């Protein structure tokens, strides 16, 4: 059995889709569905069971799961509050750090593979670079509580010298199908697609640094299908451990991204640059780019999709379809 926490969420459900495509359906999904629409991510997926995250956590704390621990091959821990604007620091600490620590300890106690989600938000404003070398991690200074909640678990792993016993993934700007429930945290591609359909125009934030023109701010945009391929590789290579970046390794501009959406929709670009909210200016990243040397040295050999190809697949095969969710046949 493979346990996927956050298994109804964006990356988690995409990974379940990947597991299904590899013929695996002995999967326990752990999540909190609540009143959101993310249950729709599960409809086309095959899995053994679902547990609410709080019930699962209590079972782990009591070491009393409804199955033998020896049946569990891996825990892929994607569950977290991923909102970069969440202000409740206590909630983020408990939900993103303490919960993860408890699962990691349980996995280690039972010799279970543990793969967890860190984040590129740990890099803060990027002035410390984007190296995933372990010696560099303590130097990072996140600029929001979400990033810090991820950073503090990476530091816990290093402090307890566990980096050779589990794998952490610093996801960069992930986009793709099954993100639809995320509201304000959906990708700009998703938002742009709907803006174009409704108004023909896309709005982007202006730049406030002279070295970046409006729309010239850069991100490492990575397709969720590429991410789950990397996650599958880590699952298949349990001797590969540590904290790894996961991006394409090539930053592109917001203008590139929006132009790719227009091209996929066969429309002429029309971009309006708007003022950035004051509260966002002091925590805005102008440049992110994953340094991918470490994962490649570990043996990962995979060509990431180009931005244009990824956007076209997302728009044409999902966003423009009546059911845009990942399914076993796609």
Regions found by a protein language model. Give the residues of each.
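Amphipathic terminal alpha-helices
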Residues: 305-330
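C-terminal "lid/loop" region of Rossmann-like NAD(P)-dependent oxidoreductases
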Residues: 207-214, 243, 258, 266-287
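Glycine-rich phosphate-binding loop and adjoining beta1-alpha1-beta2 segment
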Residues: 29-57
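Catalytic helix-loop patch of NAD(P)-dependent Rossmann-fold dehydrogenases
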Residues: 94, 98-102, 109, 113, ...
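Conserved C-terminal active-site "lid" loop/helix of NAD(P)H-dependent oxidoreductases
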Residues: 224, 278-301
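NAD(P)H-binding glycine-rich loop region in Rossmannoid oxidoreductase-like domains
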Residues: 44, 53-54, 59-95
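Glycine/proline-rich active-site loop of Rossmann-fold NAD(P)-dependent oxidoreductases
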Residues: 174-190, 198, 209, 213-217, ...
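N-terminal Rossmann NAD(P)H-binding glycine-rich loop of SDR-like oxidoreductase domains
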Residues: 3-22
């Amino acid at each position: 059995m493979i346990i996927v926490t956050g298994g109804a969420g964006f990356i988690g459900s995409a990974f379940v889709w990947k597991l299904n495509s590899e013929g695996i359906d002995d999967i326990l999904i752990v999540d909190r569905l609540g009143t959101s629409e993310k249950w729709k991510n599960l409809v086309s997926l095959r899995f053994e069971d679902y547990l609410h995250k709080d019930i699962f956590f209590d079972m782990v704390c009591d070491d009393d799961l409804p199955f033998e621990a020896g049946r569990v091959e891996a825990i892929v821990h994607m569950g977290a509050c991923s909102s970069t604007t969440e202000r409740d620091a206590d909630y983020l600490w408990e939900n993103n750090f303490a919960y993860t620590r408890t699962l990691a300890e349980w996995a280690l106690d039972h010799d279970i593979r543990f793969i967890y989600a860190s984040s590129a938000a740990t890099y803060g404003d990027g002035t410390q670079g984007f190296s995933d070398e372990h010696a560099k991690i303590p130097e990072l200074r996140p600029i929001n509580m979400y990033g810090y909640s991820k950073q503090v678990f990476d530091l816990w792993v290093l402090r307890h010298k566990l980096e050779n016993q589990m794998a952490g993934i610093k996801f960069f700007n992930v986009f793709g199908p099954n993100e639809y429930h995320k509201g304000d945290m959906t990708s700009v591609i998703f938002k742009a697609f709907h803006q174009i359909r409704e108004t023909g125009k896309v709005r982007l934030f202006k730049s406030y640094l002279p070295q970046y023109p409006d729309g010239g701010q850069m991100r490492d945009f990575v397709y969720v299908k590429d991410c789950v391929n990397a996650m599958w590789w880590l699952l298949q290579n349990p001797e590969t451990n540590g904290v790894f970046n996961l991006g394409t390794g090539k930053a592109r501009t917001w203008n590139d991204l929006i132009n790719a959406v227009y091209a996929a929709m066969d429309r002429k670009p029309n971009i309006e640059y708007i003022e950035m909210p004051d509260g966002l200016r002091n925590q805005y990243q102008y440049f992110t780019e994953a340094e991918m040397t470490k994962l490649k040295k570990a043996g990962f050999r995979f060509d990431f999709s180009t931005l244009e190809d990824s956007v076209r697949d997302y728009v044409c095969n999902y966003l423009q379809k009546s059911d845009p969710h990942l399914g076993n046949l796609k």
